Amino acid sequence: MNVTVTVYDKNVKYRLEENIKNNKGPSNDDQPAYNNESKSTDGSDYAMFPTNIKYIFEDNNDELVDSSDAALTAGIDKVGDELENVIIVQLDESGSLEDITLISDQYELLSHRTNSLSLEENQMRTLSSHGDDKSNDEEEELSVDSDRFRVDSDIELDVISQFCDLSPFLRDLSLNDLIKLYVTQNEQLQMLSNSV
């Protein structure tokens, strides 16, 4: 099973920084600029790809889970490493997302999305990629093993980083743009308070 995790920081400061870097204010054509529903395609998100994965474990219900400090920090060098942000992804046996948790002092989880290929789509993709290797004259059948027919999941997290002073970015914004900005921040705060 392949799991890809992408984290999008929805903090409005990134959109404001982009506007200043491009030496332009938000235009009327740029409607989703401060919209909470905007995706990375409009450039309003700061995308991060977690790569410092220390350990992955499977919880087997038949075994006693070791919850000691040594087990929970396996693979972490006490002197050189310090965990800053932890994303816990719980998948069931079929690879479907059961739960996701973000433990962080710098970020709060707003929402998450999954985009999983079904088993049939994975099988078709695998068969078509291996189809060139087999000739039609051979009567061999492709065996179904767990390595070749796995479920691939893309998990996207929308997070919000700590609010910061935006006053240097706000000087050239119109009243309409300021209203959109504060509406977006209020929606984000409402999502956070609803999750508590």
From Swiss-Prot:
Compositional bias per record (Polar residues), positions renumbered to this chain: 22-43, 120-129
Instruction: Show the segment(s) annotated as Disordered.
Output: 20-45, 120-145
Q: Keyword set for this entry?
A: Autophagy, Chromosome partition, Cytoplasm, Cytoskeleton, Karyogamy, Microtubule, Phosphoprotein, Protein transport, Transport
Q: Which domain of life is it from?
A: Eukaryota
Its GO biological process annotations read: autophagosome assembly; autophagy; autophagy of mitochondrion; chromosome segregation; karyogamy; nucleophagy; piecemeal microautophagy of the nucleus; protein transport
Q: Compositional bias of type Acidic residues: which residue ranges? A: 135-144
> Which cell locations does it reside in?
Cytoplasm, Cytoskeleton; Preautophagosomal structure
What is the deletion mutant like?
Answer: Decreases the percentage of cells having vacuolar ATG8, impairs ATG9 recycling between the PAS and the cytoplasmic pool, and reduces autophagy by about 60%.
Q: Can you name a GO cellular component term?
A: microtubule
**Post-translational modification as stated in the protein's UniProt record:** Highly phosphorylated. Ser-174 is phosphorylated constitutively. Phosphorylation at Ser-174 is required for autophagy induced by various autophagy stimuli such as nitrogen starvation and rapamycin treatment.
Query: Any idea which residues bear Phosphothreonine here?
Result: 41
Query: Which positions bear Phosphoserine?
Result: 38, 40, 44, 116, 135, 143, 146, 153, 174, 195
**Intrachain disulfide bonds:** none
Task: Please classify the protein's predominant subcellular localization into one broad category.
Answer: cytoplasm
Purpose of the protein: Plays a role in starvation-induced autophagy. Involved in mitophagy. Functions with ATG17 and ATG29 at the preautophagosomal structure (PAS) in order to form normal autophagosomes under starvation conditions. May be involved in microtubule function, such as chromosome segregation and karyogamy.
Further facts: Present with 486 molecules/cell in log phase SD medium.
Q: How does it assemble?
A: Forms a stable complex with ATG17 and ATG29. Interacts directly with ATG29. The ATG17-ATG29-ATG31 complex interacts with the ATG1-ATG13 complex. Note=The interaction with the ATG1-ATG13 complex is induced by starvation.
The protein depicted here goes by the name Autophagy-related protein 31
Species in which this protein is naturally found? Saccharomyces cerevisiae (strain ATCC 204508 / S288c)
